Amino acid sequence: MPHSKNQRKHRHHSHSERRRQPKRLTLTAKQQQMFDELLRTLNLTFANKKLLVQAFTHSSYVNEHRIQSCKDNERLEFLGDAVLELAVSQYLYKAFEQMSEGDMTKLRASIVCEPSLAQLAEELHFGELVLLGKGEEMTGGRKRPALLADVFESFVGALYLDQGMDAVYLFLERTIYPKISEGAFSHMMDFKSQLQEFIQRDNLGHIHYEIVQERGPAHNREFVSEVVLNNETLGVGTGRSKKEAEQHAAQQALITLSQKKEQ
């Protein structure tokens, strides 16, 4: 039986609708495996996996693939930036009780700046997970510091939305906080002066520094310094120079004194 005009018209619309259906973002098995491996490494879970993937989705990928249901990571980056500032501020406030507002601001700026966040993202292999457009890929976007720093922030934003602030603190305890404690950002701070002020203000006694060890070949020397207060070692630090080792030792001493004050 020949099809009526209406039936032919309806069938034509069905084909058009099928053709116009929005594309969906589908991860390859390898990409899915990489995301799973990341969560295992960080000992984290995501209830909403779409948020996790969004954190690694660059705007160039969305624009190139025209996937309607797929969002880029820019809004998550905006949120993550604020969450990261709060989490780092709280850590500094608690760990360095004697530090002035101005010094905390300087130290925080050195921690959440682009080079620092890009390095952290690189250490976590975030670049390998980013969904990029071909143009961005060809121009080396996967290794671009600005892009990596943005992804670190968007990941923090996604983690906050999915799991809350406690999960963010746990993540930072495995990534940023140990580096602060180890003095990775201490080139921005004069911890020796801060320690001296702290000791004098509270009349705790007299401190002195001792280089207790030198190790490594002459061209790659490493020094170990102790800072001692009234015959008690308050902090130990290492560095490529005696001054750097003393700065790191002073930073450890400040953390020790802050913890003692809380007890």
UniProtKB/Swiss-Prot annotation:
Residue numbers annotated as active site: D81, E153
The enzyme's E.C. designation: 3.1.26.3
GO biological process: mRNA processing; regulation of gene expression; rRNA processing; tRNA processing
rRNA-binding is among the record's keywords: yes
Domain DRBM residues, every copy: 190-259
Main function: Digests double-stranded RNA. Involved in the processing of primary rRNA transcript to yield the immediate precursors to the large and small rRNAs (23S and 16S). Processes some mRNAs, and tRNAs when they are encoded in the rRNA operon. Processes pre-crRNA and tracrRNA of type II CRISPR loci if present in the organism.
HAMAP family: RNase_III
UniProt protein name: Ribonuclease 3
Species this protein is from: Halalkalibacterium halodurans (strain ATCC BAA-125 / DSM 18197 / FERM 7344 / JCM 9153 / C-125) (Bacillus halodurans)
Gene symbol of the encoding locus: rnc
